[in-house]
């Protein structure tokens, strides 16, 4: 077996891991674009020659979830190379592409329309997997397990070949609504592990308290008690956040939960998949905003509301209209996503100003805390190696409170151990 970390050993996002079997089967786990705002002006794989060289001879690509820093190059992969992702993950991205297509249609941008249609066709050709059900690419076996993350339908992967068992965590956390299931998976299903490839996004955060999604929900409820009119700016696909927000709003009788058509489509996708397993993820009563819905506007002014917003021309029209009708002292914007976007995006700063002077920052990470990383390493206790990825170059995995024998297994450079070749870029 050979394990290559093409990218991710010294950066967050854009991770690319390759696993080769002795028989010559080669798979990639994630093929994502660098995160926006990074020091690199361009992603080197934006160059078709570099991407072509990377995927030459690859037997299949498995995506742990649908964030762009894991999935970003999917549409540039030749059809001959099979690509795999969770079924719900695929449908969530199809919803995003459908919304982009609607915008392109309205602006009559032919080249953009064709590009989006092509991406959708490539995504529809994906092979989908289900948590707990094994599939194979050549002689490499893969079994995905659901994990909590800020992207719904995220998975860690158990990968087996040449008599070795490798766990790739993808992105995960314990402080999401379903995060408590992680320990059960680690204890029951991931035994006798040889190699652990784990994210380390939060390594440099120290041991500070990281809020749980339940705490976030409680903070939202408190704000809804203080303010009648609550706008929330967050990712349209952060379903834990949106489900908690919906549940918080439901405690205030008569208050509509308002969104646009696209967001409601995502709610329907969430309900159809995750709603089968938990009522928390049933969001079937959202009301779609329109300037023509005068009765809805009257109800919002009378009862108050929670409205999920994004920065685009349609929402700007709606906000400009609504802010003329609302009492500013009873109105607040809850900013519930990465704070750095406010520093990086001038347009977002302008959008936020539309809501007046009341703003609250209510957010938590989608990634494993140091405590969770320690638990993963300790419970899996890999026999051969621990490979930290998806981490800042300055972060120190050895600063975790794990046993010395586990620290001895942390690999940050190329080597060969117990018949496994490690190549780390």
Where are these regions (language model features)?
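Metallo-beta-lactamase
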Residues: 27, 33-35, 93-154, 159-215, 231, 270-296, ...
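Pre-active-site segment of Zn-dependent metallo-hydrolases
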Residues: 11-14, 18-63, 72-76, 85-121, ...
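Active-site neighborhood of phospho(di)ester-bond hydrolases with catalytic His/Asp-centered motifs
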Residues: 7, 28-31, 58-69, 83-87, ...
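Catalytic core of the metallo-beta-lactamase
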Residues: 4, 12, 18-22, 131-189
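Hard-cation-handling environments
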Residues: 205-330, 389
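C-terminal regulatory/interaction regions
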Residues: 11, 251, 285-425
């Amino acid at each position: 077996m050979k394990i290559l970390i093409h990218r991710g050993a010294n950066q967050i996002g854009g991770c690319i891991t390759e696993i080769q079997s002795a028989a010559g089967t080669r798979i990639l786990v994630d093929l994502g674009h660098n995160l926006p705002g990074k020091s690199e002006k361009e992603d080197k794989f934006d160059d078709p020659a570099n991407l072509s060289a990377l995927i030459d001879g690859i037997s299949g690509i498995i995506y742990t979830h649908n964030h762009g820093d894991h999935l970003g190059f999917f549409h540039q992969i030749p059809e001959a190379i099979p690509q795999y992702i969770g079924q719900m993950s695929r449908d969530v991205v199809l919803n995003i592409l459908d919304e982009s297509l609607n915008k392109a249609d309205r602006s009559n941008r032919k080249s953009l329309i064709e590009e989006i249609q092509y991406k959708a066709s490539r995504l529809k050709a994906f092979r989908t997997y289900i948590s707990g059900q094994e599939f194979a690419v050549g002689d490499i076996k893969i079994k995905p397990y659901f994990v909590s993350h800020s992207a719904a339908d995220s998975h860690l992967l158990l990968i087996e070949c040449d008599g070795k068992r490798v766990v790739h965590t993808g992105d995960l956390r314990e402080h999401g609504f379903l995060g408590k299931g992680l320990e059960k998976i680690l204890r029951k299903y991931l035994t006798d592990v040889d190699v652990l490839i784990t994210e380390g996004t939060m390594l440099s955060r120290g041991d500070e308290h990281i809020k749980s999604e339940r705490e976030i929900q409680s903070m939202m409820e408190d704000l809804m008690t203080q303010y009648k009119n609550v706008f929330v700016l967050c990712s349209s696909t952060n379903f834990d956040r949106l489900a908690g927000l919906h549940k918080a709003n439901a405690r205030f009788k008569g208050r509509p939960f308002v969104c646009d058509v696209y967001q409601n489509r995502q709610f329907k996708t969430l309900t159809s998949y995750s709603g089968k397993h938990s009522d928390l993820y049933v969001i079937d009563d959202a009301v779609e905003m329109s300037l023509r819905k005068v009765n809805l506007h009257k109800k919002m002014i009378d009862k108050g509301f929670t409205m999920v917003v994004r920065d685009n021309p349609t929402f700007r029209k709606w906000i400009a209209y609504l802010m003329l009708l609302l009492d500013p002292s009873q109105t607040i914007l809850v900013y519930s996503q990465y704070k750095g976007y406010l520093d990086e995006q001038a347009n977002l700063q302008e959008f936020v100003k539309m809501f007046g002077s009341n703003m609250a920052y209510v957010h938590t990470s989608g990634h494993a805390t140091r405590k969770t990383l320690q638990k993963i390493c300790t419970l899996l206790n890999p026999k051969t190696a621990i490979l930290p990825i998806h981490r800042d170059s300055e972060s120190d995995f050895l600063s975790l409170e794990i046993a010395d024998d586990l620290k001895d297994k942390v690999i940050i450079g190329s080597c060969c151990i117990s018949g496994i070749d490690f190549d780390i870029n």
